[in-house]
């Protein structure tokens, strides 16, 4: 977050045409969502092998094509090509970073999304620091590049290139933020997005997402929303099917796509296989809805101990889905593989697979991290020396055994930090070292022991991330990474970047 209602995108560590192209797309995406003007702060692009004239002619084309409102160029080369940027409404050029910082131009930036893009030698960290709104905050950093790497990791496991991919973005994309995740997945041509309820789907549509969207848990009151926003519901029993048909007929809708769920052993939702003949007759008796896919849900595809049962599920699904397919002349897609199934049961990939937790960096097979996507971090608010005989926190639960340095950080159970992690049961990282939680975790704040850590107020504390896997927290809590990710509250700011 920047000063004067600005949003900053800091990509000040490298600069080349390819990364500029990607970063400009990111800038456009953020400005469209927020309705703000687009500003680019760009340094000379070094060591490209192109002539200065050729290079900056291409840069000018990229900037113009993205509708950049304001360009701030820094460096001798880009300044010498100022005339090439006439297609940008506002243009300012400075010979070096010091001149930019002295100019006072930052005071004129209001309600803009600002992309800071520069080569390392220009020290644009100083620019970012000058523009950044200085607040104590807890943020969830989401690495979109890592997420795409995870997507491609699982795509590489597909036996056939024509196998389609459904990506799960329900529960705010497992806590990462549904719009940015959905937008990135759409750009990488996934075939379907899946959310839990119609409201999640309609919000994505309003934000400009055009990909096909499946509603996994449709409610009887949400049919109008699904019709209006072209959201395709899962249908799992006759009560829901009949109500949906009636609502579609009332609206004069025909051939509205649905996704038929079969119960092959989860015993949560779905038609039983012996109901399929009746289901076929019901579907053929009307033209309001049409089955787009038929699917089921593995119970334990992540564990070898359930392999016999998983194979039984596959066999039952093959039987039931084939019966449904043969009753219709159009192609009905089949899918049963989740993240673990993609890897462990490639023979069951059928026409489509569903990618969930693996997209967000966690392998459900062994809880290992593929490419870490989310990092939860916060800032030390205060450090105090506490005598060894004192206690820390509510109910005096933080018992000290020595004189200690205790730091307060602005994250609590209202942010999604589980209370069971307190009282020394877990730790965060401060400057790369373990800082145990002391006493009870409070609603908005918790305390950590930094006695043996060289740190000061304002330093960062990492709750989970690259060096402290989220699975460490979930293991401490005796739960799964899904729960930890989806527990991060909406008041925690999401910050997106591409590595």
PLM-predicted stretches and their roles:
Residues 1-66, 148-166:
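Nucleotide phosphate-binding/pyrophosphate-handling subdomain across enzymes
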Residues 12-21, 49-53, 175, 264-277, ...:
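Active-site glycine- and acidic-residue-rich loops that bind
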Residues 29, 113, 118-129, 134-136:
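ATP-dependent carboxylate/acyl-activation modules
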Residues 139-143, 148-149, 162-335, 349:
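Active-site-proximal beta-alpha core segment in soluble small-molecule metabolic enzymes
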Residues 12, 37-40, 46-112:
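C-terminal helical cap/extension that packs against the catalytic core
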Residues 141-143, 148, 152-156, 164-165, ...:
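Active-site anion/phosphate-binding pocket segments in diverse small-molecule metabolic enzymes
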Residues 2, 115, 429-430:
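A general beta-strand register signal
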Residues 11, 44, 71, 116, ...:
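Residue-level signal for inorganic ion chemistry
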